[in-house]
């Protein structure tokens, strides 16, 4: 593997000194970029794009050609794991992801098998190794998965949900069934992420998109417990260096202390969290990633610049901050505004790393 030329993202996650605050964007390879739309059209549909290693590599690299980003993230989808478990993933126009065979009964859960990441998910591993090779050591590659709870919400509900009625009914009326599902998913995600590291991922991120829908105690029981299980089983060294792990629960600002106890290296913050407060609470244990409201990218470049200034000042001096949005970039954002955001982070952050 090529020697890593820019490792400030990995260094910041481990709270080692950096020259400027590293920056990348969730969904940086996505629909706001015209070149992404062209490649997706070439692929035919979203999952065909994910399953084609060369095209997945191409869209992963597209934002790096435009912007001075400090990391690349694998182009894939969190629902690849349940799809590999045989649920029949498809995308309904205007509806988002759906499953032909939801796992909403104990019987269905019992029948689920944990997929072999090198077999059923071999197309993801091929994409990881292709991207790592084509990056040529420019920046590190982030691998990722959804959290067990978040994957389970889609599997039990049969797709996206606003109320989470079916899975919450299972959580409170049939908790043993849900725990069986979450346990299988924790095993599947651990294998999946370790396979990504074996194929070239240099950092890992677990996206708990729907953990914030849970009550205080239910979050620990149904989400955090299974992320803890994954963290305990992850490969944390490869290529002679540490493989940092970031946990991100959207709406998880209440639980930062508990998340930091898992042994992860960093926590992702959404935009509802004050980063100065987060650093006071958990900055002695973990690095922090975030946390500009993605909608701020609709503002003028001058206003974006000011928002970046405020967030950097909120975190303050020293390493341990990876700048990002508080969630994925919106599809209608002007790519020039994303560029202004990235430039502002590098320009304004040097003073905090003297």
Swiss-Prot record:
Catalytic reaction annotation: uroporphyrinogen III + 4 H(+) = coproporphyrinogen III + 4 CO2
Protein's cellular compartments: Cytoplasm
EC number(s) from the headed UniProt entry: 4.1.1.37
Tagged with keyword Lyase: yes
Pathway given in the UniProt record: Porphyrin-containing compound metabolism; protoporphyrin-IX biosynthesis; coproporphyrinogen-III from 5-aminolevulinate: step 4/4
Keywords, sorted A to Z: Cytoplasm, Decarboxylase, Lyase, Porphyrin biosynthesis
GO molecular function: uroporphyrinogen decarboxylase activity
Any single GO BP term: protoporphyrinogen IX biosynthetic process from glutamate
PROSITE patterns found in the cross-reference section: UROD_1, UROD_2
Cellular component aspect of the GO annotation: cytosol
UniProt xrefs under InterPro entries: UROD/MetE-like_sf, Uroporphyrinogen_deCO2ase_HemE, Uroporphyrinogen_deCOase
Binding annotation for substrate: 27-31, 77, 154, 209, 327
Site (Transition state stabilizer): 77
Signal sequence region: none
Oligomeric form and interacting partners: Homodimer.
Protein task: Catalyzes the decarboxylation of four acetate groups of uroporphyrinogen-III to yield coproporphyrinogen-III.
PANTHER family with a match to the protein in the record: METHYLTETRAHYDROFOLATE:HOMOCYSTEINE METHYLTRANSFERASE RELATED (PTHR21091), UROPORPHYRINOGEN DECARBOXYLASE (PTHR21091:SF169)
Entry's family note: Belongs to the uroporphyrinogen decarboxylase family.
Protein name per its UniProtKB record: Uroporphyrinogen decarboxylase
Species this chain originates from: Shewanella loihica (strain ATCC BAA-1088 / PV-4)
Top-level taxonomy: Bacteria, Pseudomonadati, Pseudomonadota, Gammaproteobacteria, Alteromonadales
